[in-house]
């Protein structure tokens, strides 16, 4: 074993067995270090590893004995006799050591078990000779690198070690030296074993890519630079001719980009090598390699400001380089057939055709070349398969997708007389607006095509190269779904609103007609009773006619009892002053009483404020006293409610405000100009004008009759309307509804002085000019007879229609809801299903065998959780109905008015009707007791008589409809077994509406859950399918790698290129989506004609 160490180290030292092949004479340093040899002898396993890591550096004159493309079963026979080593070193090794080294040698050769088996069967002597020859060859490789130390000449007599190549390339050599180094490296990568390539690849790949990038970035490229680029590409191709190199290339982000940048149609040979490499990467690359490849091609195109596939098409145009045309077609086929998505394949193919391939196809078909014919046939066959698959997707629409006329007619026929047709027309019209410019117009269409492709291809995988552009990053799927759903919802809602409106109108008319009919029936019965009474008294039959009808108030049923204590405020006129506004009618709330905002009086305003602020006030939380401003002229006052210091809190916003920073003279000047208390002209008038305006100002403050608060409120009212007092009086007398408004009458009722004050003001009519404005207004209004009853009656008239419109829909909603509940068969079936499920679940309990249940239980169904706490009994019922009893699902639509009925309060409805009747009675009484008119403007009685009659009729109808509604609700109590007096309408219908809403939500959640489960199931199937396809692809890749005869796995690129050239790489990539033979559609009948690269279809 020591001699084995010496023999192995003799390859690097001067030991006794180093004569053969001159291997032992190259290392002088090891000859004088016996201690090191002894250390290596003690660590023989490590030494064996070192031995098997050596590689032979091949020269042009002496090829390596073990080639990677030969048959290893005949390796020993093909070894030249001169290289068979016969020395004593082979006799020193034991049989176990020889076998161990033999296994190491085969592993170094990257042989699989299938290739190792025949070699293991060889005779032991042959194995020993192979091991000794292998040791000698690796020793010679070290001698060549250490002794000669580099490249001796351009003939490449000697080569460098892998690390020396890395160092040489990093040293910055250029031109001829770089070319010689790269050529030597190419030979070494081609001839050395895989382990040498591995040692070089860890650092060498990055150095090679740096060299290529540096060469590509040079602005002035000489001929030698182009040669060096070509040599780098050749080195990369040789480096990739094994699995390790291929994986390293695919793992480096720069490699694909630099390869794409190096594509140059002017350098035919280099471009041929590059597109071959890229073609091989397309068909054997790992996951997402297509994304990286397209990204690199797109980025390179953007750097050169060109279409990304234009260089490939330019390569096809070079008729003088047939090998380049074949390689470009190989790349097109490899790239277009790689995606597993039909839309993406069509998108890539169309992009090539758009770049000029379509116009070139006829010319290429005329070239007689077997390799080119294979690639063209593959292109057409895959194109036909994709079009066939697209036709199946479009229900066998037979059309020629490459002909613009055919595509337009196909699209037009699809959209004709549909909702999408106007949008197509709008799109085409917008196309006509594109500028008619030779250069700009194609760019418009390019942008439009990119946007359309992103929208259309988004759901099935966006073209990955778009991430290198200004991408439209929108999820148009949800947008389109939302638009479609919104359009459907809007259309259905519009129809539903129209039908609902018509139905409500018809139902309201029916209810009113029934009420009128019921009223007339009662009248008939009353008259018949009276006739019977008269006949019983013996009155002769010749009665002049029926007695006159009873007075109007007594025509209807007896008035209901007075309202209960808690009812809302009644209509105006029912309660003595001050009357509240009508229920539901938003009166203008009284603002906080401000000081009189009329003409400012001479005394300093506001009186009584300054004395309060005379002393210093200590402000809380460290606040400082606000600055006191002194304007040059009197300013208008802002009527705000002041915050007192005691109202401040520590976190209030007022502590943080610093308004002083906005102080400036321009602001104050503008304020003085805009908001003075009097105009300039008034200030500049002479004493005569002052004397005229002065006395009244002093008398404004002198209230004779009214108190300050009442005067202030009246001032606010008069300032809001700014109408002459006589005009206000006349529109009230005339009951001029065009000028009157609800707010005006409400404010008058609210702020007008009481009758005693008005009577006193009437006595001051002679002193009218000396009175303040509120009292002047009081004097004018005091002349109107029965002013407050008149105002309350007018207010009732103005708000009557609004109250009718509030009461009538509530009655109709409850009436409809009662009828719907009784008529709904689907709701009955649902109750049946719930009763069944409940009795089953309650088996063995006191609630078992129930005959029914309280209707309020429906809202509690959701409280029963499932065992896994993920669902409820309500979800279960909704699912059962959805799957087996779909007719039950109609009940939410059949109970349409339950929601509106649940918002009706029976107490408020009754009180509103009572208030309406009381208002009508008061109005009738006022009309009866109204004094004769003293002015031609007074038309109160005239207008109120007709209104009273109409109001009475409307009320009678509403009262009858309300009575019918109560009867229906009482019958509903009997129907569902509940006490109508205990369970009010709002509670009953509210519970039903809540259950209806919860049921619909449960149904929606079930659908959503099923969709999620279906998505998960499809995702799982898709994942399994993807895994299966991945395994199949890996199997196909392995088949592609092993497609040649027996040999090691170092010829990966050679095998892939051969598969591409022969078309075998594309055979299993077609027809990715198998169809069921039973459901297969009949084949498309196409008549094909070759014209300009397009196929016509009939």
Swiss-Prot record:
PANTHER family assigned: PROTEIN DIAPHANOUS, PROTEIN DIAPHANOUS HOMOLOG 2
Comment block on domains: The DAD domain regulates activation via by an autoinhibitory interaction with the GBD/FH3 domain. This autoinhibition is released upon competitive binding of an activated GTPase. The release of DAD allows the FH2 domain to then nucleate and elongate nonbranched actin filaments.
Biased segments, Basic and acidic residues type: 36-52, 1007-1032, 1075-1087
GO molecular function: actin binding; small GTPase binding
Domain GBD/FH3 per the UniProt entry, residue ranges: 90-463
Annotated function: May be involved in oogenesis.
Oligomer status and interactors: Interacts with MAPRE1 and APC.
Family per similarity comment: Belongs to the formin homology family. Diaphanous subfamily.
Pfam families hit by this protein: Drf_FH3, Drf_GBD, FH2
Protein name (record): Protein diaphanous homolog 2
FH1 domain mapped to chain residues: 544-620
Species name: Mus musculus (Mouse)
Record PTM N-acetylmethionine, positions in chain: 1
Keyword Coiled coil: yes
Keywords: Acetylation, Coiled coil, Developmental protein, Differentiation, Oogenesis, Repeat
Region (Disordered): 1-62, 537-565, 578-611, 679-699, 1007-1047, 1063-1098
One Gene Ontology term from the biological process aspect of the record: actin filament polymerization
Segments forming domain DAD: 1048-1078
Stretches assigned to coiled coil: 375-416, 490-539, 999-1050
InterPro entries: ARM-like, ARM-type_fold, DAD_dom, DIA_GBD_sf, FH2_Formin, FH2_Formin_sf, FH3_dom, Formin_Homology_Diaphanous_sf
Domain FH2: 625-1025
Biased composition (Pro residues): 543-565, 578-608
């Amino acid at each position: 074993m020591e001699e084995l160490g010496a023999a192995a180290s003799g390859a690097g030292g001067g030991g006794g067995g180093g004569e053969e092949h001159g291997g032992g004479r190259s290392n002088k340093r090891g000859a004088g270090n016996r201690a090191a040899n002894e250390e290596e002898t003690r660590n023989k396993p490590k030494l064996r590893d070192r031995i098997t890591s050596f590689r032979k550096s091949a020269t042009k004159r002496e090829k390596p004995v073990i080639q990677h493309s030969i048959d290893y079963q005949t390796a020993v026979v093909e070894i030249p006799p001169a290289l068979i080593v016969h020395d004593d070193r082979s006799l020193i090794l034991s049989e176990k050591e020889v076998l161990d080294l033999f296994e190491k040698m085969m592993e170094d050769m990257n042989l699989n078990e299938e290739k190792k088996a025949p070699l293991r069967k060889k005779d032991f002597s042959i194995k020993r000779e192979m091991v000794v020859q292998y040791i000698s060859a690796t020793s010679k490789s070290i001698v060549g690198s250490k002794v000669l130390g580099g490249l001796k000449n351009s003939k490449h007599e000697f080569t460098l070690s892998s690390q020396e190549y890395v160092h040489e390339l990093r040293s910055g050599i250029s031109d001829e030296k770089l070319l010689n180094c790269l050529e030597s490296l190419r030979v070494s990568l081609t001839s050395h074993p895989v382990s040498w390539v591995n040692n070089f690849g860890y650092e060498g790949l990055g150095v090679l890519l740096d060299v290529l990038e540096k060469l590509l970035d040079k602005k002035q490229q000489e001929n030698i630079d182009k040669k060096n680029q070509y040599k780098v590409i050749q080195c990369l191709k040789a480096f990739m001719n094994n699995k390790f190199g291929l994986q390293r290339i695919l793992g480096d982000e720069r490699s694909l980009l630099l390869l794409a940048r190096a594509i140059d149609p002017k350098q035919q040979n280099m471009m041929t090598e590059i597109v071959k490499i890229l073609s091989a990467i397309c068909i054997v690359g790992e996951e997402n390699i297509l994304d990286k490849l397209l990204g690199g091609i797109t980025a390179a195109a953007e750097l050169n400001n060109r279409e990304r596939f234009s260089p490939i098409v330019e390569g096809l145009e070079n008729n003088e380089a047939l090998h380049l045309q074949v390689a470009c077609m190989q790349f097109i086929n490899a790239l277009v057939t790689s995606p597993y998505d039909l839309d993406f394949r069509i998108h890539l193919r169309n992009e090539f055709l758009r770049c000029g391939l379509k116009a070139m196809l006829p010319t290429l078909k005329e070239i007689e070349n077997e390799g080119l014919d294979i690639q063209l046939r593959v292109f057409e066959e895959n194109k036909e398969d994709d079009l066939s698959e697209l036709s199946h997707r479009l229900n066998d629409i037979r059309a020629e997708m490459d002909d613009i006329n055919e595509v337009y007619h196909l699209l037009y026929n699809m959209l004709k007389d549909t909702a999408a047709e106007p949008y197509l027309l709008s799109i085409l019209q917008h196309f006509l607006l594109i500028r008619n410019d030779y250069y700009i117009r194609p760019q418009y269409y390019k942008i439009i095509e990119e946007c359309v492709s992103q929208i259309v291809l988004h759901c099935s995988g966006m073209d990955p190269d778009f991430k290198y552009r200004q991408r439209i990053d929108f999820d148009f799927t949800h947008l389109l779904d939302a638009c479609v759903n919104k359009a459907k919802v809007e259309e259905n809602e519009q129809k539903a609103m129209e039908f609902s409106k018509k139905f409500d109108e018809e139902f309201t008319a029916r209810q009113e007609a029934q009420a009128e009919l019921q009223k007339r029936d009662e009248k008939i019965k009353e008259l018949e009773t009276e006739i019977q009474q008269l006949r019983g008294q013996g009155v002769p039959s010749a009665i002049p006619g029926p007695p006159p009808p009873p007075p109007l108030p007594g025509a209807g049923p007896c008035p209901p009892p007075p309202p209960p204590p808690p009812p809302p405020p009644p209509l105006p006129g029912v309660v003595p002053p001050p009357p509240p506004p009508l229920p539901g009618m938003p009166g203008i709330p009284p603002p906080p009483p401000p000081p009189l905002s009329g003409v400012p009086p001479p005394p300093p305003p506001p009186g009584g404020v300054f004395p309060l602020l005379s002393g210093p006030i200590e402000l809380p939380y460290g606040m400082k006293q606000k600055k006191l401003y002194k304007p040059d002229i009197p300013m208008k006052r802002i009527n705000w409610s002041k915050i007192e210091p005691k109202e401040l809190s520590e976190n209030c916003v007022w502590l943080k405000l610093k308004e002083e920073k906005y102080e400036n003279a321009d602001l104050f000047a503008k304020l003085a100009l805009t908001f003075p208390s009097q105009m300039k002209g008034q200030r500049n008038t002479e004493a005569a004008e002052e004397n005229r305006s002065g006395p009244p100002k002093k008398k404004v403050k002198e209230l004779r009759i009214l108190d300050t608060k009442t005067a202030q409120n009246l001032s606010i009212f008069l300032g809001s309307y700014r109408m002459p007092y006589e005009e206000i009086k006349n529109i009230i007398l005339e009951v001029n509804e065009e000028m009157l408004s609800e707010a005006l009458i409400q404010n008058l009722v609210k702020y007008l002085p009481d009758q005693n004050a008005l009577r006193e003001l009437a006595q001051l009519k002679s002193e009218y000019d000396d009175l303040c404005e509120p009292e002047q207004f009081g004097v004018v209004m005091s002349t109107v007879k029965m002013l407050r009853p008149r105002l309350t009656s007018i207010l009732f008239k103005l708000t009557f229609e609004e109250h009718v419109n509030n009461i009538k829909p509530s009655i109709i909603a409850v009436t409809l809801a009662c009828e719907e509940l009784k008529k709904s068969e689907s709701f009955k079936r649902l109750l049946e299903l719930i009763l069944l499920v409940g009795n089953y679940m309650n088996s063995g309990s006191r609630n078992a065998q129930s005959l029914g249940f309280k209707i309020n239980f429906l809202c509690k169904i959701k409280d029963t959780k499932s065992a896994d706490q993920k669902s409820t009994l309500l979800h279960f019922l909704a699912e059962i109905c959805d799957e087996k009893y779909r007719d039950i699902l109609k009940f939410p639509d059949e109970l349409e008015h339950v929601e509106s009925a649940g918002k009706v309060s029976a107490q408020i409805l009754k009180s509103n009707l009572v208030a309406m009747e009381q208002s009508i009675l008061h109005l009738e009484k006022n009309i009866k007791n109204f004094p004769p008119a003293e002015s031609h403007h007074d038309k109160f009685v005239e207008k109120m008589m007709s209104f009273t009659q109409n109001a009475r009729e409307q009320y009678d109808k509403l009262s009858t409809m309300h009575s019918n509604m109560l009867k229906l609700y009482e019958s509903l109590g009997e129907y569902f077994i509940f006490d109508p007096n205990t369970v009010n309408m709002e509670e009953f219908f509210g519970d039903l509406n809540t259950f209806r809403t919860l049921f619909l939500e449960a149904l929606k959640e079930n659908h959503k859950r099923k969709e999620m489960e279906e998505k998960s199931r499809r995702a799982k199937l898709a994942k399994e399918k993807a895994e299966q396809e991945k395994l199949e692809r890996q199997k196909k890749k392995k088949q592609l790698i092993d497609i040649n005869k027996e040999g090691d796995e170092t010829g990966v690129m050679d095998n892939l290129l051969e598969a591409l050239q022969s078309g075998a790489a594309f055979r299993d990539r077609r027809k990715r989506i198998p169809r069921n033979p039973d459901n297969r559609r009949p084949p498309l009948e196409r008549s094909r004609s070759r014209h300009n690269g397009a196929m016509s279809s009939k």
